[in-house]
Amino acid sequence: MGADCKSVAKATQVRILHLPPQVRAYFSRMPFGVDRSVVIRAEHLFGPDYARALVDRDLTTIEELVAVTPTKLRSEVRRAAGRIAELGGWIAQDSGDPVKAEQLTRRAEDHVRSADPALRAMVSMRRSNILLASDPRLAVELAADAAQLIEGRSVGRLAVSVARQRALAAIADRDRARFVAHAAHALDIAPTEPVADDHAVYANSAYVAAEVASGFIAINQPAKALDLLLGHHHGWPAGQRRDHAVASARLLRTFIVLGDYHAALDHMDVAVRGYLAAPSDRARRELRLCRRIIRDRARADQHFPLRTLRRRIEATLQGDTEP
């Protein structure tokens, strides 16, 4: 490694000394490894702004390293840069900034263009997820690209997450038949065990069930969504509090869609506690949907459960100006 590269690395080491111990391990692995779980823990501990700044600083450092790294090592550095950029995109998306998420994930695509198929598939899948609302047709194509990249390969739960993403892209593109087919496949392979260096270890059965449940609500099958959500409500690992909070808010929405307002009231405390303990844009969107449904129905129904639900959700979303 040349003198310029060493000076950048030394600057990184100096910066490590000033980091909280919970995230120091992340930088100690640079530039050739990215411990996603440590950054996610940092976000939980210090908030998304801290984690985003952490990733932005490190991405700048490693992109400087790319320019001065010998050719034979450059692919490893680019691979690490791609993983950092993808992680930054994930944090931006979960914080409600899809524009920044798209920018960072495109940078990740640039860095991993010659990487192994599994990593390229993961980045394509992530970009597909970011584009669900703004460009569902491209989201479908990117998810299909991801599936093609890993076809016939042993990639553990990444295959599960890609199948789930194909289902979400299909429903975003209003393709009911493809959604049902991809959702069935994702649920079928959801018990897959993770492999070493699995890019989607989070994609367990509870996660997949919660994700595809939103699609079943969209195609007017809320009873199916309810079965999926209740079947895994107590099966979440401790390390996925945020995903669990999203699922809990989605369960609240499902009760409301079904008109079971007493069940929704019974579940309200659980959903609110989960959201406040592990807030995310995903959970906030679920609560906004709950608010919208209740507002529409309250025009014709002023009974106690609806009034109480509306008051509780309005209080939880206090200050939120989105419709």
Please provide the spans of the model-predicted regions.
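N-terminal export leaders
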Residues: 1-16
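Conserved binding/catalytic microenvironments
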Residues: 20-323
